[in-house]
Amino acid sequence: MNARVAVLGAGAWGTAVAKVIAGKGEDVVIWSREAETAAEINGGHGNSRFLPGVKLPENMRAVTDITEAAGGREFLILAAPSLYLLDTVKQILAVPSIREGETVIGVITKGFLPGSKGPRLILETLEDYLPGFYRKSLVYIAGPSHAEEVSRGKITGLISASESAKNSIRFRYLLKSNRLLVFSSFDVRGVQAAAAAKNVIAIAFGMLDALKTAAGNTGAGDIFGDGTESLLLAAGLNEIQILGRAMGATHAETFTSISGVGDLDVTCRSVFGRNRRFGRDIIEKHILNPFRNLDDLISRIGEIGYLPEGVVAARHVKTLAEKYKLRIPISIGLYRILNRETEPVQFLHDFLNGLR
């Protein structure tokens, strides 16, 4: 393609996507907030902080000046965590190629963003900040994937969702390879809602998984098993569908394909999942003990040492449930745990009792 690509965000997922594209011979620059990370990518062709053990292509270079990274690029991929995404977008608004609509913009960030009337999907929020010609042309990329696997060439599938068929296809060809399969979707709202909401379910799944494997040390009793996890997974998928429809999803198959059940499954079950890991840490390491409530946890999230997107999403999902009058007990229960209103074991018993 001979594409000029910028990836804004040098975390694990941004680095993995940049590696895939650079590995196809494209001109790729990645923007890093941290000078140390940029120096390591350029000098040692690695990113030991976010993607240890992965060798990066020599034609992939890093910069710390965001306008240098974004300027004159044909493709721009936003990879900052949801907490920092709007700040990243505001920094590129003065870039001429962005201001003049010469760049196709894709987003790989998962989550919701705050709005004046409550939480919003990522693309609809970004459209308010970007020039008007980007409306209905942004591309959202999601699917059952982990940076640790994609960067090592494990076969994986992604969804390229956009109201612009042309731009969806352009990103498909930019990303796809023999080991990375990319499919198109026009249900942009459904794909975004599923990608954000599944992180909340994954934290609950991680708690259950920890209780299942260490029940004797928690006082929960040896009552949780693989079948219990399947109950939670199925009920969680139903909650994602309920929320997605309320937010404007247009296709039922969005939730039965890789953007729905596929993404939920890998997020819940993979050892690489940060949300699953956080759920396990709630049980095994009592990681919530230093925090008074969810707001305190979010404001001090850096103390965790990694960023589970489901923590931020839980607050937004709770607000959306109230706005749309939705019954989504797993998501609300998880919010109450993070807000220090209830204990994990009690939540799981309440959830199971609610199924009877």
Task: Please tell me what each predicted stretch does.
Residues 56, 63-155, 171:
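Rossmann-like NAD(P)(H) cofactor-binding subdomain of soluble oxidoreductases
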Residues 5, 27-28, 136-138, 182:
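Hydrophobic anchor at the start of a short beta-strand
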Residues 129-137, 155-253:
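Internal alpha-helical scaffold of NAD(P)-dependent oxidoreductase catalytic cores
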Residues 198, 205-213, 230-237, 241, ...:
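NAD(P)-dependent Rossmann-like dehydrogenase/reductase catalytic/cofactor-binding core
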Residues 7, 30, 105-107, 140, ...:
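Structural beta-sheet core signal
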Residues 1-53, 60-64, 115, 221:
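NAD(P)+-binding Rossmann beta1-loop-alpha1 motif at the extreme N-terminus of oxidoreductases
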